[in-house]
Amino acid sequence: MEKAIVLVNLTPGSEEQSMSALRSTAGIKSVYQLYGLYDLLVMVEGADDQAVKSIIADSLRSRPGVVSTITMKVLS
């Protein structure tokens, strides 16, 4: 299994709706609301790098309310 941590910036007021939708998305293992520079921390897990990339591109970055993301691949 491949894993990634994604930091997400959202449009103001979209936090609850985004968290709820992401928590029910296949491949997204955890969603945490943050205070500070980023709004959410999202843990993504997939069978391989391509699966992780697809989850991030298709299910996370394309969501309404998502302004920007920073992705960090987990090595161990």
Model-derived features: where do they sit?
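A compositional/biophysical signature of low hydrophobicity enriched in polar/charged and small residues
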Residues: 1-76
